[in-house]
């Protein structure tokens, strides 16, 4: 009887991602699209293999809000069950393009309305198809486990490795945009908070954080090491990773950073001046690892999920084991 009750409890619906978490992800996703589009435009114009792209913390906030609006629009697809083509190819793209044009004019704060070219309209339409066919469908299937326990499985990861890599890569782009924007604010008094990064940073941060996460699982869960014991290993690995990537990219004139004018640098690829920043980022990474452990995918192939993204509950993730693992940040 008790086993039956446990089984029923384990199959209880998991809550959807809370709104603050969705907006956090939305901001990162929007900044990533900014970097992708601006770096592609720069590469086509200048053939610059550094793949520099631009965004700002302001735009991150704007993206969080606009993505939330787009989420609400996407959830209206239940009214188009008999006409899905109209929704995916006409209704959603039209509202998406109008919203992007409106936001573009508001952000630039110009008196004259910006003229949108045919190329920009095509890009917006392609992005709208990506949002309605891929992004919303996948993102709104994510669920958030109970904050006190995690269900034990053969691997402690809640999300597939590819999705974790993408998350870490996007977060790395956001980190660099925020850092460079704050740096420009103090050094150049740039109140626009314009920041920049490189598409290569997506691969560098994604792979680095992916490996550091494995170190966290091993050192924290298996060996019981505390934060102060893990931190030196994190820092050494981060510096080694940054140097290795920088050295490789420099061979092809694709390295987007040069610390030669900073003190305590080595070959201009790493500098101890940024040590406090790496320490803070490493501590924050442990928190992110614990949060991601609680995010899982809904494995059910339901055609419609009308409550996805709302404050209700989603369907459970298939068969779940009964063993539970307490997770904390130590």
PLM features per residue range, with description:
Residues 1-330:
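Aromatic-rich, lipid-facing transmembrane alpha helices and their immediate juxtamembrane interface loops
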């Amino acid at each position: 009887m008790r086993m039956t009750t446990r089984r029923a409890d384990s199959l209880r619906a998991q809550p959807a991602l809370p709104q603050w978490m969705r907006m956090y992800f939305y901001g990162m996703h929007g900044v990533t699209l900014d970097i992708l589009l601006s770096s592609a435009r720069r590469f086509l114009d200048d053939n610059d293999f550094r793949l520099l792209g631009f965004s700002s913390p302001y735009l991150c906030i704007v993206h969080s809000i606009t993505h939330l609006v787009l989420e609400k629009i996407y959830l209206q697809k239940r009214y188009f069950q008999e006409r899905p083509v109209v929704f995916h190819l006409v209704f959603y793209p039209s509202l998406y393009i109008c919203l992007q044009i409106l936001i573009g004019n508001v952000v630039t704060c110009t008196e004259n309305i910006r003229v949108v070219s045919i190329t920009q309209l095509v890009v917006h339409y392609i992005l709208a198809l990506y949002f309605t066919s891929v992004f919303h469908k996948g993102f709104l299937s994510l669920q958030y486990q109970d904050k006190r326990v995690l269900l034990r499985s053969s691997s402690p990861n809640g999300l597939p490795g590819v999705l974790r890599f993408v998350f870490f890569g996007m977060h790395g782009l956001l980190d660099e945009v925020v850092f460079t924007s704050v740096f420009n604010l103090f050094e150049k008094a740039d109140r626009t908070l314009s920041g920049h990064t490189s598409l290569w940073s997506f691969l560098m941060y994604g792979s680095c954080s992916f490996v550091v996460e494995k170190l966290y699982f091993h050192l924290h869960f298996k060996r019981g090491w505390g934060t102060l014991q893990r931190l030196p290993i994190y820092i050494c690995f981060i510096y080694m990773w940054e140097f290795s990537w920088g050295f490789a990219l420099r061979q092809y004139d694709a390295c987007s950073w040069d610390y030669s004018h900073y003190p305590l640098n080595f070959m201009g690829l790493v500098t101890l001046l940024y040590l406090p920043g790496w320490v803070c980022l490493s501590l924050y990474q442990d928190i992110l690892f614990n949060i991601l452990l609680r995010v899982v995918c809904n494995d059910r192939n339901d055609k419609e999920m009308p409550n996805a993204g709302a404050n209700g509950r989603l369907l459970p993730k298939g068969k779940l084991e009964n063993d539970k693992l307490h997770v904390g940040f130590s």
